[in-house]
Amino acid sequence: MATTKRVLYVGGLAEEVDDKVLHAAFIPFGDITDIQIPLDYETEKHRGFAFVEFELAEDAAAAIDNMNESELFGRTIRVNLAKPMRIKEGSSRPVWSDDDWLKKFSGKTLEENKEEEGSEPPKAETQEGEPIAKKARSNPQVYMDIKIGNKPAGRIQMLLRSDVVPMTAENFRCLCTHEKGFGFKGSSFHRIIPQFMCQGGDFTNHNGTGGKSIYGKKFDDENFILKHTGPGLLSMANSGPNTNGSQFFLTCDKTDWLDGKHVVFGEVTEGLDVLRQIEAQGSKDGKPKQKVIIADCGEYV
């Protein structure tokens, strides 16, 4: 597989972004082999762009689909394939040294979103002063009983925002109740990255490559009204636009670079401590230290 299909150019980076931030942002899409952030040695700061190399070309393509024109530390970033035309494989020269395309785009951010500032859409958390019980009357609540290793860890209770994303919420609700004949019970959280997210929902292949929705194999992104504003938010995992199935993730922290790319459809109302126990089983590459199983799940009626 050509290296150029695996190396991404990431431009428009804020000063706060470092290799750890980039690793956390891009690791959900696959194994990363290298991250380079060129420095300006006069200012001792990075130059506003970076290169992320994936092990597999298809993972790099998924990262482009999800991360291009997303927001990271308040800046809209560009994510494209790096195109080092004159550098041979194995060369020790940095890939940005001869690439006019990179010089053109380094440090550039998109301006389109500036006009939209000030009209921020509703966020996933409830409005200040509004009791959670008010939404519970119209929105379903579901639960998952978690087992870590061979020991019960507790229950996570979640409110599904059917008032905002009814199709996505109904898919998740039915997968919790198994009323369609299949669902989450007995499946695992196969990808866990501390300070980022815990991903599960692949009840067919159990490795992030499978799962299915109640509507068939995949369904479209419903909307992106709700945002990834903090820990305990429930969002759809995908492999690009309009590829929702059954896989989902629970955020461990604010992950605003996923806004507009993944559909947020719920939030943890009880059991955030259980989510933290799941998070503690994670690793930088996402492989859990112990098996984390959804031992039981269902709906509060």
Swiss-Prot record:
Pfam families according to UniProt: Pro_isomerase, RRM_1
Alphabetized InterPro entries for the sequence: Cyclophilin-like_dom_sf, Cyclophilin-type_PPIase_CS, Cyclophilin-type_PPIase_dom, Nucleotide-bd_a/b_plait_sf, PPIE, PPIE_RRM, RBD_domain_sf, RRM_dom
Record Gene3D superfamilies: 3.30.70.330, Cyclophilin-like
PPIase cyclophilin-type domain span: 143-299
Activity regulation information from UniProt: Enzyme activity is inhibited by cyclosporin A.
SUPFAM superfamilies in alphabetical order: Cyclophilin-like, RNA-binding domain, RBD
Record's keyword annotation contains Repeat: no
Gene Ontology BP terms: mRNA splicing, via spliceosome; positive regulation of viral genome replication; protein folding; regulation of DNA-templated transcription
Region described as Disordered: 107-137
Keyword set includes Ribonucleoprotein: no
SMART domains, alphabetized: RRM (SM00360)
Molecular functions per Gene Ontology: cyclosporin A binding; mRNA binding; peptidyl-prolyl cis-trans isomerase activity; poly(A) binding; RNA binding
SUBUNIT field: Identified in the spliceosome C complex. Component of the XAB2 complex, a multimeric protein complex composed of XAB2, PRPF19, AQR, ZNF830, ISY1, and PPIE. Identified in a pentameric intron-binding (IB) complex composed of AQR, XAB2, ISY1, ZNF830 and PPIE that is incorporated into the spliceosome as a preassembled complex. The IB complex does not contain PRPF19. Interacts (via RNA-binding domain) with KMT2A (via the third PHD-type zinc-finger).
Domain notes: The RRM domain mediates both interaction with RNA and with KMT2A (via the third PHD-type zinc-finger), but has much higher affinity for the KMT2A PHD-type zinc-finger.
Family from the record: Belongs to the cyclophilin-type PPIase family. PPIase E subfamily.
Protein name stated in the entry: Peptidyl-prolyl cis-trans isomerase E
Organism: Homo sapiens
Record lineage: Eukaryota, Metazoa, Chordata, Craniata, Vertebrata
Chain's gene name: PPIE
